[in-house]
C-alpha cells in the first residue's frame, strides 16, 4: 500500500505483478491542486522515465532533479541504488504562488557510435527545455515564449523533436563553444491548435507524443493537431519540417487523442 500523493519507482514481477523492489521518489506537491492540476493531469513524478543500456532508470522528479537509479539484478538480495543525481531546480523558472513548474520528461541524446550518452534532454510542463551534460552536470536551457508542453518528445540522430501546445520543433545543441552549449532551433512548424482543449486533453493543443518514421535523411515526423471539428494526422519531413500531408480523423466534434501514433504493426 502506498500513499496517493507518493511517487515510487517499482520493480514488478512480469507474471504476477508482485512488487519486488521499490524506491521512494519526492512526492507530488499539494500546490498543484491549488492551480487546478489534479493528480490525473499531473505529468511529473517520474511517469516519463526510461531505462538505459546499463539497466538504470533515468527519472525526472517533482522537486526538479534527474535521478540515475540502478535497477537490481537480483531483487531477492539487492534493491534500487541511486547512482547519480542532477539538480535542475536552479534551471526551472520560479512562478507566482501557488503555481509550480516541474520537470516531467527526460530522454537521452542520440549517442555517438561506441560511446555512452553525452547529454540528457529534459522538458518541464511550462515549456522549458534543458540539456544536461552527463559527465559534468552542466545545464543549458531554452524556452519558446508562452508555449507549454503536454507530451513527450522523440530523439533522432539529427536532433530532438519536441512539440508544444502550438508548434512542432527540431532542436539541437551547438557545442562549438567548449565551455557553453547552446540549444538551437533547426526548424519550427506551427499546427492548428483549435479553439479549446478537447475532452481528454490537458492543454489547448495536440494530445499526441511525437513519432519518428524512417531515417534522418528521408524520414517523417507524425503528430496529430487539435483542429476543429476534426483532428488531423499530419506528417512532416524530418530534414526540414516541410508538411507532407494532413488527413482528417474520426467524426466531427468526436475526435481527440492522448496517445502516440503507431502503424499497423504497433511501431
Residues of each region from the PLM?
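Extracytoplasmic/lumenal domain signature
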Residues: 1-43, 65-267
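Short, conserved beta-strand segments within well-ordered enzyme catalytic domains
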Residues: 24, 50, 58-60
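N-terminal membrane-targeting/anchoring modules of bacterial envelope and secretion proteins
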Residues: 46-52
Amino acid at each position: 500500500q502506498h500513499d496517493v500523493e507518493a511517487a515510487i519507482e517499482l520493480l514488478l514481477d512480469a507474471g504476477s505483478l508482485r512488487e519486488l523492489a521499490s524506491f521512494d521518489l519526492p512526492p507530488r506537491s499539494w500546490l498543484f491542486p491549488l492551480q487546478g492540476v489534479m493528480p490525473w493531469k499531473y505529468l511529473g513524478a517520474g511517469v516519463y522515465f526510461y531505462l538505459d543500456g546499463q539497466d538504470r532508470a533515468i527519472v525526472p522528479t517533482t522537486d526538479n532533479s534527474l535521478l540515475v537509479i540502478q535497477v537490481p539484478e537480483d531483487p531477492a538480495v539487492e534493491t534500487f541504488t541511486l547512482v547519480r543525481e542532477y539538480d535542475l531546480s536552479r534551471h526551472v523558472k520560479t512562478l507566482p504562488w501557488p503555481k509550480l513548474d516541474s520537470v516531467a520528461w527526460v530522454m537521452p541524446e542520440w549517442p555517438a557510435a561506441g560511446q555512452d550518452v553525452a547529454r540528457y534532454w529534459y522538458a518541464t510542463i511550462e515549456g522549458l527545455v534543458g540539456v544536461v551534460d552527463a559527465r559534468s552536470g552542466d545545464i543549458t536551457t531554452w524556452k519558446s515564449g508562452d508555449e507549454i508542453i503536454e507530451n513527450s518528445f522523440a530523439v533522432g540522430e539529427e536532433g530532438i523533436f519536441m512539440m508544444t501546445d502550438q508548434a512542432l520543433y527540431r532542436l539541437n545543441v551547438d557545442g562549438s563553444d567548449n565551455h557553453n552549449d547552446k540549444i538551437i532551433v533547426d526548424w519550427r512548424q506551427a499546427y492548428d491548435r483549435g479553439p479549446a482543449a478537447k475532452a481528454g486533453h490537458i492543454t489547448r493543443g495536440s494530445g499526441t507524443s511525437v513519432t519518428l518514421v524512417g531515417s534522418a535523411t528521408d524520414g517523417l515526423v507524425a503528430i496529430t493537431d487539435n483542429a476543429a471539428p476534426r483532428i488531423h494526422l499530419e506528417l512532416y519531413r524530418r530534414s526540414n519540417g516541410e508538411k507532407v500531408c494532413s488527413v482528417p480523423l474520426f467524426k466531427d466534434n468526436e475526435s481527440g487523442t492522448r496517445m502516440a501514433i503507431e502503424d499497423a504493426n504497433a511501431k
